[in-house]
């Protein structure tokens, strides 16, 4: 196929030499009729050249019986032109008119450009070279190439552009190597720095020369990077457009408030970088299961007032997060610990203390009872009559005096005065109360012992013994002496009970 194209080019060059040697002005009048008198000399030369070209191409078509597909389009277009010019004396005017109608100014500009390309390397023509102009119209190919300076038929403009693109690809390879000298292409990603295939793909559109200074065609952000990298310095801090990639140097400046900065920090170099900088995290992100060195290294830097933070192990951090109680935050200098954090310490330290809602009053009450009892009994008002029988039931269970009076007096068991003098002076009431404080709150008071306690008016030791009678029911049940005196059992009036309650 290339040999066939070379033969056609040789024949056209011979025809052009004949055209330049002979001057033909025979059909000037008819060309002025068709063209309006503007380009009469050009049209007469073109019309006469069409006749000679068609005659020479008809001889070539007879000598080549089997031609490939790209060549067959050329021969089809030439054969259509040949059938019209087979009788040259009668149909030359029709051929001129049709060839003139096909042409437009953009196609008239092409032969002058294709001449310079032919002079460089004429025999090297790609396979799909002749497809471009012959697909425009079947009769165009004889007429386009027949001005004064044209030397080819099947040399379209795409072949030179294809050759320019092949040259551009060759020239783009050392440029790509020079710009990628430090970084391998796998580390590039799809950032703004990938510019080596851009020259090869887009070179068909612009015919500008390719080899230039290294960063002139590209974005202005690329040129200082190339100049630095050409010095062989690989430790270059990247500009801040590259902060989205997973480099440890670029991740230092990113203070991420959502805690996602700990996702990518797996390599030890990133852990070192993050540990040296102070990153304020939320509380939940700091409690994830991580090696404890990085968390507590920040604590020792930020919390200088609390030296025992670094001593806490990793398991306590996990327990605090699993209890759904907010743990101590990482910058604890600024605020006092909240109420949840104070309760969290109690939950960690005592595992046996299970607070149920029914007995929540029983858990808190011993300290209150002890404080009220110690404040009332240790004052100097102990020996006054009705104000010193301390009963928690007065604040918890208020009962009317009618229910107290319904009890029979035989159920009362009070210490005898002789027993109480011996025991109470040996151990005072405050130690007894302190001893039996927990048994008071955990055991339910029987209303029998609560309600039927009477005021004893005789001696101050009996006043103290009445407190022992009330607050120690287990001690009362062991006593065998029953008081049946009418002084203590029968003469207590409802007024005294009302004063007591």
From Swiss-Prot:
Biased composition, class Polar residues, residue ranges: 61-95, 103-122, 132-168, 253-274, 367-381, 478-495
Main location: cytoplasm
Disruption phenotype: Leads to mitochondria aggregation and segregation defects.
GO biological process: intracellular distribution of mitochondria; meiotic cell cycle
Domain of life of the native organism: Eukaryota
Residue span of region Disordered: 61-274, 328-381, 478-501
KW Plastid (keyword) present: no
GO cellular component, one term: microtubule cytoskeleton
UniProt GO molecular function: microtubule binding
Subcellular location: Cytoplasm, Cytoskeleton
Alphabetic keyword roster: Cytoplasm, Cytoskeleton, Meiosis, Microtubule
Biased composition (Low complexity): 234-252
Task performed by this protein: Involved in the cell polarity process and in regulation of microtubule growth. Has a role in meiosis. Involved in microtubule dynamics. Binds to mitochondria and microtubules, attaching the tubular mitochondria to the microtubule lattice at multiple discrete interaction sites.
Name of protein: Microtubule-associated protein mmb1
Gene coding for it: mmb1
């Amino acid at each position: 196929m290339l040999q066939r194209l070379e033969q056609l080019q040789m024949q056209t060059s011979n025809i052009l030499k004949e055209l330049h040697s002979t001057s033909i002005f025979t059909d000037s009048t008819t060309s002025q009729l068709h063209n309006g008198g503007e380009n009469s000399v050009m049209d007469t030369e073109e019309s006469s050249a069409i006749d000679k070209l068609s005659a020479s191409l008809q001889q070539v078509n007879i000598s080549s019986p089997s031609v490939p597909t790209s060549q067959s389009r050329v021969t089809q277009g030439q054969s259509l032109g040949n059938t019209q010019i087979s009788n040259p004396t009668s149909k030359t005017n029709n051929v001129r008119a049709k060839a003139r109608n096909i042409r437009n100014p953009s196609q008239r500009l092409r032969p002058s450009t294709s001449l310079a390309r032919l002079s460089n390397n004429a025999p090297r023509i790609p396979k799909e070279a002749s497809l471009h102009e012959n697909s425009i119209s079947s009769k165009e190919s004889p007429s386009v190439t027949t001005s004064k300076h044209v030397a080819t038929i099947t040399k379209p403009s795409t072949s030179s552009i294809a050759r320019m693109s092949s040259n551009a690809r060759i020239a783009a390879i050392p440029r790509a190597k020079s710009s990628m000298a430090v970084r391998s292409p796998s580390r590039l990603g799809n950032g703004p720095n990938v510019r080596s295939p851009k020259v090869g793909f887009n070179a068909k559109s612009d015919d500008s020369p390719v080899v230039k200074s290294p960063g002139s065609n590209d974005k202005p952000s690329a040129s200082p990077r190339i100049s630095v990298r050409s010095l062989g310095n690989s430790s270059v801090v990247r500009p801040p457009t590259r902060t989205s990639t997973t480099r440890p140097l670029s991740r230092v400046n990113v203070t991420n408030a959502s805690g996602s900065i700990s996702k990518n920090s797996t390599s030890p170099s990133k852990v070192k970088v993050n540990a040296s900088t102070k990153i304020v995290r939320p509380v939940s992100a700091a409690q994830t299961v991580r090696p404890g060195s990085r968390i507590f290294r920040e604590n020792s830097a930020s919390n200088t007032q609390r030296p025992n933070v670094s001593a806490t192990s990793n398991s306590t951090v996990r327990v605090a997060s699993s209890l759904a109680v907010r743990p101590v935050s990482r910058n604890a200098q600024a605020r006092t610990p909240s109420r949840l954090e104070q309760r969290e310490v109690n939950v960690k330290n005592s595992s046996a203390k299970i607070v149920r809602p029914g007995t929540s009053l029983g858990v808190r009450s011993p300290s209150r009872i002890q404080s009220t009892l110690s404040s009332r009994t240790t004052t100097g008002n102990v020996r006054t009559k009705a104000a010193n029988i301390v009963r928690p039931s007065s604040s918890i269970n208020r009962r009317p005096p009618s229910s107290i009076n319904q009890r029979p007096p035989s159920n009362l068991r009070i210490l005898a005065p002789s027993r109480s003098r011996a025991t109470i002076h040996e151990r005072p009431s405050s130690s007894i109360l302190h001893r039996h404080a927990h048994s008071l709150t955990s055991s339910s008071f029987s209303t029998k012992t609560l309600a039927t306690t009477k005021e004893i008016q005789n001696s101050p030791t009996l006043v103290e013994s009445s407190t022992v009678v009330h607050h120690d029911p287990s001690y009362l049940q062991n006593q065998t002496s029953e008081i049946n005196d009418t002084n203590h059992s029968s003469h207590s009036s409802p007024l005294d009970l009302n004063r007591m309650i």
